[in-house]
Amino acid sequence: MKLYDTLTKTNVDIDANEINIYVCGPTVYDHIHIGNLRPIVTFDVLRRLLEHSNKKVNFVHNLTDIDDKIINQAQRLNLSEEEVTKRYTSAYFEILDELNIKLPKIVKVTDVMSGIIKYIEKIYDKQYAYELDGDIYFDTTRIADYGVLSKRKLDEQISGIRVKSNENKTSPNDFVLWKKTVEGIKWNSRFGLGRPGWHTECAYIIDQEFKQKGFVIHGGGIDLVFPHHENENAQNLALHNKNLVNCWVHVGYLLIDNEKMSKSLNNFIYVKHLIESHNYRAIRWVFYNTAHTQPLNFDGTIIKAAQKDVEKIISTVNRFRTFLIANKNNIPSSSLVCEEFKKALFDNLNFANATKVIWDLIKVLNESIAYKKIDENIWAYQQLIWCLEIYGIVPDMIHNEQIIDQINQWSELLNNKDYEKADSIRNKLINKKVL
């Protein structure tokens, strides 16, 4: 398998039998929007693909549950910070479940605070950090390769930290490792009361979870390349003299009316609202027709088209299941590897080519129904189910005992040429969306 690596700007071979994946999670101060969802769905597909290819996958996902945004939201809602993070963490988990996302290992920042503090102390003791007005800053001038990921010249860069910048820093690119504060939840450290910087939280979790061993893929949105991922990498260079991961995979922007979707622009769509009005499979399908690295313009037409596509897929699967039963076959309980689909996704997650394979299989199933060649094409059904498993959108099995009995009655009536009664049952099956 090959994946495009942001750092080397080349396709990197993913040959290891055990793969470590880390994807930056949300700051749990609000519900996630559809732009937040794209990396989650993309890496869920990658995980499923690797696991279906007999790879062991260690997938870690963080939750940032301390941040100025959380403090501000708590004040707005007249809640404690813990109440805010609990509310939106629970909402996030509900969305992952409703969208059929295989749950990664979740690491909350507050659960690993003692380790983060020790991590900062190590950086400081190696003289890659300095104190300024009570805050601890990472000294980016000590890293010769600073900018290696984002390919930016130092004078083009900005700190991009989530707190107000100090003009007296050694370099404008220096970022906070430890922020002195009297507001909100805080921890004691040798640097005084405060809390860690955002960039350090993720860098520590990756270091702690994977121990600088194995093949590591780091994923996230393209907007995180700089400064977040650049600064994660800088800390690893300081402590271990090596880049943080083996492959950086960044997912393209989601656009609304050709503008980046973001809460700051107030042009976002909450995922929870989409789920209320659309099949979760359609929401996932939106991401399966465009290269994951490219921008995706989201509007009403794209979700409507996805809904229609998914309805066609579900209809074909259910109809084929019905004709399997009518032909006295069992519905296969196992799938078959679809090599063409796998080949497409192994080529840097080529969603366009992979999705074309699905439509080719749909065509085979529809033709097998039309020309009464069900038995000869069971393989196509099994391959289609395998593809849909990777995409996380396998149609539910709605052929219960009652429906199976009706299908058998319908088939028997047709064989006996009792067409009037057969049509009556056929209409019932159509209403149940299995014919």
From Swiss-Prot:
Which EC number(s) are documented for this chain? 6.1.1.16
This entry's Gene Ontology molecular function terms read:
ATP binding; cysteine-tRNA ligase activity; zinc ion binding
Q: Where is this motif: 'HIGH' region?
A: 26-36
Where it mainly occurs, coarsely classed, is cytoplasm
Q: What class of enzyme is it?
A: ligase
Gene Ontology CC, one term: cytosol
Keyword terms, alphabetized: Aminoacyl-tRNA synthetase, ATP-binding, Cytoplasm, Ligase, Metal-binding, Nucleotide-binding, Protein biosynthesis, Zinc
Spell out the SUPFAM superfamilies in the cross-references. Answer: Anticodon-binding domain of a subclass of class I aminoacyl-tRNA synthetases, Nucleotidylyl transferase
Q: Which cofactor does it need?
A: Zn(2+)
User: What is its quaternary makeup?
Assistant: Monomer.
The name this protein goes by in its record:
Cysteine--tRNA ligase
Q: Which organism is it from?
A: Mycoplasmoides gallisepticum (strain R(low / passage 15 / clone 2))
> Gene encoding this polypeptide?
cysS
